[in-house]
Amino acid sequence: SSTVRIHIHTNSPEQIFELVRQHGEIQQRKVEDMVHQHQEWIRSEKDRVGIVTDSTCDLPQEFLDRYNIRVIPLTLAMDKDEFVDKVTITPEEFNQRLSFSSSVRTSQPSPGAFQDAFAAALNEHDGLVSIHLSAAMSGTWQGAVAASRNSADRIRVLNSKLVSIGLGMVVLEAAKRAQKGATIDEVEEAARAAASRTRFYVGLDTLDYAVRGGRVSKGSGLL
């Protein structure tokens, strides 16, 4: 067997990973966001408070770029393959694989992923408000809290008690306030207020995928 190290600059990392998977096993992967690195040089002085969230927020990329929102991706495990959510697999590809994958799991970002994201964001901003999906659904919020302890005076971590576009609306409200020059206290309060008045309803055509992901028991899935 042989090992190959590949270094590529691309706007479509998920396509590169899919191509490489066709020729062998990926032992280690690393993806860096060059857009955010460039934005360090052009950010507004008003942008004192940065917004961080996770990849479940489901905001369109246009809004993430416009408001300089930093996203920490979760990991998706589909059968024997692992993907970095919305980085090495797109939502469209996820949906395609979902139809034939027998096992689908998500896992929270690693402690190192949180620490790296917070360190990079603190180079751009005086403080951060980090807003995440419901702590009842994932350990992501707890991971963010743990990673923020060494910079607790500069990082506020919020459990939105929401997910998907519900979380996205809270993140967007906080980002708008931050871009207007609000203080970290004001941005945090805006996020908490938005979360408290947001209600998120979901209708499912089938419980099959919820059962596969472990969110619903097999017994409940039969009802």
Question: Could you say what each language-model-derived stretch is?
Answer:
Residues 49-54, 131:
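Short, hydrophobic/glycine-enriched beta-strand segments
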Residues 1-3, 37-39, 44-48, 56-66, ...:
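Mixed-charge interfacial surface used for oligomerization/domain docking
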Residues 99-143, 188, 195:
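Glycine-rich phosphate- or other oxyanion-binding loops that anchor nucleotides, phosphorylated ligands
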Residues 52-113:
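N-terminal glycine-rich anion-binding loop in soluble enzyme alpha/beta folds
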Residues 5-7, 127-134, 156-159, 173:
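Short glycine-rich or small-residue beta-strand-to-loop segments that form or flank ligand, phosphate
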Residues 22-25, 47, 123-126, 151-153:
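Short glycine/proline-enriched coil/turn segments at helix->beta-strand junctions
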Residues 1-42:
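Gly/His-enriched, cation/cofactor- and phosphate-binding structural elements
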